[in-house]
UniProtKB/Swiss-Prot annotation:
It is an enzyme of class 5 (isomerase). Residues 163-248 form the PPIase FKBP-type domain. It comes from the Bacteria. SUPFAM superfamilies: FKBP-like, Triger factor/SurA peptide-binding domain-like, Trigger factor ribosome-binding domain. It comes from Bordetella avium (strain 197N). Its EC number is 5.2.1.8. InterPro entries: PPIase_dom_sf, PPIase_FKBP_dom, Trig_fac, Trigger_fac_C, Trigger_fac_C_sf, Trigger_fac_ribosome-bd_bac, Trigger_fac_ribosome-bd_sf, Trigger_fact/SurA_dom_sf. Pfam families: FKBP_C, Trigger_C, Trigger_N. It catalyses: [protein]-peptidylproline (omega=180) = [protein]-peptidylproline (omega=0). GO terms for molecular function: peptidyl-prolyl cis-trans isomerase activity; protein folding chaperone; ribosome binding. Keywords: Cell cycle, Cell division, Chaperone, Cytoplasm, Isomerase, Rotamase. This is Trigger factor.
Length: 436
């Protein structure tokens, strides 16, 4: 008789399972005989130990495995007969009431996948982001490259300004008491690069070699030095040297120093533009993808299995702990990480994943081999040896699968953009790159 599947609530189901004690014992004896051929029992040659002794030493573990195997088989048969897609693993509880001695009975509680209805994509409102790369962006990048290769010349009587290299002594106290890391001699830094706190840089700006200045400095609440975070210190600085940055001329020699094989300035600028355009494309597409995925998940109106959400939460907690360990945070494995902190985002990820999977299946948006190769080749252009990068990804199934997942998402985004209400938005370059 086919087991009856009971609907508890939402996606939760329950089914009663029964297996024969005789079938269990038959399988247990068969496995014990196989164990007997190789089991090492003191005082007996292999294969000669009495079955009663093997029953005592191996019987419980063999019986446990056999029962688990037969219950799992009964569960698979029950959900297959009911044509259910199980999400996660079932929770099993033994049943004794109304069960005869020849039967082992269990109650299996589990969740099923929801019926995923793809929303009407024409109702979605999404934004497609675009950013133009102009000569100004190329020139800014050239300036950054020049500053990275700057030399410095000491200027007597020069008032310190941005991009100058300053060498100074500093000493700080809090309530008159020195603190760790608050003192240094002949300390160099480039003014305006943000290496020092803004108040420190502002105090140094305009000073000349030989000048001394006393000023208050408030450490931010989230400052990395916990012993001074949120406190106000008094600093004394004495400038030893002010050196002006001397930038290299953009010429053939400069181009060659940056790896431009032909030492051609115009080719160097073209290379820079190409690199910027690739980065702009990645960031613009990333913003557009976020807009599309946000619209999809907002329109996804179906329940999600709690077991899948819980699995995602645990995965994210494990990932967070691993990241903390890599950053050298002590006791990362025992640090409290409440599941509810991750639950909302995990539910969103699961819901979006189910919807995207259904959309891919319905519209056949799977990544094609030629798309994967093209994406790898495009990505490889960011490296000095693109052919090696292409081979690196194509030769390994797991690495190739990573690119396939990206291409699949690209296919979904492209399909949604064809159907949805799209607003094109121009994003200023500095804003896109996080510089504004």
């Amino acid at each position: 008789m086919q087991p009856v599947v009971e609907t508890l609530s939402g996606l939760e189901r329950r089914v009663d399972l029964a297996i024969s004690v005789a079938d269990v014992e038959k399988e247990v004896q068969a496995q014990l005989k196989r164990v007997a051929r190789t089991a090492k029992v003191p005082g007996f040659r292999p294969g000669k130990a009495p079955m009663a002794m093997l029953e005592r030493s191996h019987g419980p573990s063999v019986r446990y495995d056999v029962i688990n195997s037969q219950v799992a088989r009964a569960f698979e048969q029950a959900v297959e007969a009911a044509q259910l897609r199980v999400a996660g693993s079932p929770s099993l509880e033994p049943k004794t009431e109304g069960v005869d001695e020849n039967t082992l009975a269990f109650s299996a509680t589990f969740e099923v996948y929801p019926e995923v209805a793809v929303p009407d994509l024409s109702d979605l409102a999404v934004t497609r982001y675009e950013t133009e790369v102009t000569d100004a962006e190329v020139d800014k990048t050239l300036d950054v490259l020049r500053k990275q290769r700057a030399s410095y010349e000491t200027r007597e009587g020069r008032a310190a300004q941005d991009d100058d290299r300053i060498v100074l002594d500093f000493a700080g106290t809090i309530d008159g008491v020195p603190f760790e890391g608050g003192k240094a001699e002949n300390f160099p830094f480039i003014l305006g690069q943000g290496r020092m706190l803004p108040e420190f840089e502002e105090a140094a700006r305009g000073l000349k070699a030989g000048d001394t200045k006393v000023f208050p400095l408030s450490f931010p609440e989230d400052y990395q030095g916990k012993e001074v975070a949120g406190k106000t210190a008094e600093f004394t600085i004495t400038v030893k040297e002010v050196a002006e940055a001397v930038l290299p001329v953009v010429d053939a020699e400069f181009a060659k120093s940056l790896g431009q094989a032909d030492a051609d300035v115009e080719k160097l600028k073209a290379d820079i533009r190409g690199n910027i355009e690739r980065e702009v494309k990645v960031r613009s597409q990333g913003r557009t993808k976020t807009s599309v995925m946000d619209a999809l998940v907002e329109a996804a109106k179906f329940d999600v299995p709690k077991s899948l959400v819980d699995n995602d939460v645990q995965g994210r907690i494990a990932q967070a702990r691993e990241e903390l360990k890599q950053r050298g945070v002590p006791n990362a494995d025992s640090m409290p990480m409440p599941a509810e902190v991750f639950a909302v985002e995990s539910e969103r990820r699961v819901r979006l994943g189910l919807l995207v999977s259904e959309l891919v299946k319905q519209q056949q948006l799977q990544a094609k081999p030629e798309q994967v190769r093209a994406r790898i080749e495009e990505f490889a252009q960011n490296y000095e040896q693109p052919a090696q990068v292409v081979s690196y990804y194509l030769s390994d199934r797991q690495r190739r699968a990573e690119i396939e997942a990206i291409v699949l998402e690209d296919n979904v985004v492209a399909y949604v953009l064809e159907k949805a209400k799209v607003t094109d938005e121009k994003v200023p370059f500095d804003q896109l790159m996080g510089m504004a």
